[in-house]
Amino acid sequence: MLMIPWQRAVGIGYQQEVIARLKNHTLGYSGSQINVTLDSSTDTFPLNQSLYLDFSHDTNIVSVLTAFGLRQFSQLLLPTEYPGQHNFTVTHVTPFGARLDIEIIRTPKPLAADRGGYLDGKETKYVHFVLNQRTLPLGWSMPECDAARVDGWCELEAFLRAQDKMPELARFDYACFGEYSPPEYGTVLDGVPP
C-alpha cells in the first residue's frame, strides 16, 4: 500500500483537516492541496461539531491511511510469490462504498489496555479508527500509541503528537512536483519518494 511515491502526499490534506478539527482551529496554510480559502473560515470549515461527514472516492482511503502513518499495510508484496497471511487486501480496504470512521471516545478515567477496568487518573480521550467496521490498531503503526491495547485505541494527546510530524514526512512539493526517477519496485515502503 505504501509503495507509491506520492501516496502520502495525496492524503495529507485530509489528514491536516482532521487534525485541525481535533485541535479546534482553522487552516490558514497547509503546504498541501487544501483550499485554504475554505479551510481558513469557520463559515466553510466549521469547528466544535459533534459529527463531521466527509465524502470522497473510496480509492482515496489508501492515501488517507498512508498520510495518517498507518504502517500495518506496508508489507512488501512480491509479484513472484503468494504472500500468505498479510494485512493488505485491496478488496477489504477499499471495497465499493468503503468507509473510514474516526471516533473520539471520552472515558471518566484512563481505561486499562486490556479493557479490564479503569485506572487512576482523570478523564481521558481516545481516538479509534474503524475501517469498514473493523478496528485499525493504532499502536501497530505509531510508537506513541500503546501497541498492547486490545481495543486498538490511542490516547488522543499521543495520537496528536504522532500526527504533528506527518505533513513533513509527506514531502508534498517534492512528491507531487519534484523531479525524480521512478523508483524500482519495492524501494518505496512509506509512501514518499526516495
Positions of PLM-derived features:
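Non-catalytic terminal regions with compositionally biased, polar/charged low complexity
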Residues: 1-194
